Amino acid sequence: MGMRMMFTVFLLVVLATTVVSFTSDRGSDGRNAAAKDKASDLVALTVKGCCSNPPCYANNQAYCNGRR
């Protein structure tokens, strides 16, 4: 195989890898959104627990919005 042919094959492999990667990223957007919702729920529960703890509340009043 000549150098030109090897370079062409290399470019085709890179192009194919890029296309597969791009299309698989687009398909995972819904799954990523669901994971972010779960993470925000976990953070909310953690903050609520902190707001009921007086020392933690004192350090994080901005997050507790004045509620205990």
Curated annotation (Swiss-Prot):
Expression (tissue specificity): Expressed by the venom duct.
Cysteines joined through disulfide linkages: 50-56, 51-64
Signal peptide segment: 1-21
Region (Ser-Xaa-Pro motif, crucial for potent interaction with nAChR), start-end ranges: 52-54
Single annotated GO MF: toxin activity
Keywords, ordered alphabetically: Acetylcholine receptor inhibiting toxin, Amidation, Disulfide bond, Ion channel impairing toxin, Neurotoxin, Postsynaptic neurotoxin, Secreted, Signal, Toxin
Domain of life of the native organism: Eukaryota
Residue ranges annotated as propeptide in the record: 22-48
UniProt modified residues of type Asparagine amide: 65
Record's function text: Alpha-conotoxins act on postsynaptic membranes, they bind to the nicotinic acetylcholine receptors (nAChR) and thus inhibit them.
Protein name per Swiss-Prot or TrEMBL: Alpha-conotoxin-like Mr1.2
